[in-house]
């Protein structure tokens, strides 16, 4: 992947070894009306079963995932910053989870980089979720676009 200048993109770096065994507990603590949105899809997906299926579907496509940061953000949020590989391509993601008053994940916003890896992952997620009502919110394969 070519980059201009001497800057090194953070999605090319490794994760924090202290977070090697981290698992996002919020995935199992979703509000009844939870939503997920982000750069991988158009619009949002709502409902705990649908959101869990999307999130776990994305994670299943990773060859590896290393967290750089995971921790509280503000009074009612949680932030994750991680790097991953999808079909050998580097990927970075920042996830902001907003918690409701009961401490359940109410809203998840996930933003991926770089664009080439984002598009690849979005197409793969669409294939993985084929047959669900929200599969078409992800990018179509290159041959059908």
Where are these regions (language model features)?
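C-terminal and inter-domain tail/linker signature
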Residues: 1-145
